[in-house]
A protein has these predicted regions:
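Beta-hairpin (beta-strand-turn-beta-strand) motif
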Residues: 95-96, 111-113, 121-125
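Beta-rich globular "head" domains
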Residues: 24-59, 115-123
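Noncatalytic modules at the cell exterior or secretory-pathway interfaces
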Residues: 40, 98-115
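Short acidic, glycine-rich loop/turn motifs
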Residues: 58-63, 110
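Intrinsically disordered, low-complexity Pro/Gly/Ser/Thr-rich segments with frequent PxxP/GP/PP motifs
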Residues: 62-103
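Local beta-strand/beta-hairpin segments that build beta-sheet-rich folds
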Residues: 9-16, 25-32, 67-83
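Solvent-exposed, conformationally flexible loop/turn segments
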Residues: 8, 20-23, 85-90
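Short, small-residue-biased leader/transition segments that mark boundaries at the very start
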Residues: 1-3
Length: 126
């Protein structure tokens, strides 16, 4: 199947107050089977009365690509220990795009439980 024959679906994923417990990342998105996802944007808002520290991770175990790129992916930080002031928002990707493969996970953690809200925009290619 040629990529131009595949369906592109735009989606928005929102979360109101996460993670439930500081130190336990909240899974924002998991790529479905037979799907490639392009992250178009991620905006995170601090809903707390003081600054919080945020981490955004891409967790991937994709492997078996063949050729010179036949290595297993791991966890990559898209944001690490980023301070967001009280009542402020941060655009994590700021114009960049990230490709996610089947079973990849995007997750967020915060220094204080239930104090970040956000919107994730993606395009799924199926």
């Amino acid at each position: 199947m040629c990529i131009r024959d595949r369906a592109n679906t735009f989606k928005t994923v929102t979360f109101a107050a996460e993670p439930a417990s500081a130190g336990t990342p909240y899974v924002m998105y998991t790529v479905a089977g037979s799907t490639t996802t392009v992250i178009l944007g991620l905006r995170v808002t601090n809903i707390h009365t003081t600054s919080v520290t945020v981490e955004v991770e891409l967790v991937s175990d994709t492997a078996n690509r063949g050729g010179n790129n036949n290595v297993t992916n791991g966890t990559a930080f898209l944001a690490k220990d980023v301070v967001i002031p009280a009542k402020s928002s941060l655009e994590i990707l700021a114009g960049s795009k990230i490709v996610m493969e089947t079973t990849d996970v995007l997750q967020i953690d915060c220094s204080v439980a239930d104090k970040v809200s956000g919107t994730l925009s993606v395009m799924e290619i199926t």
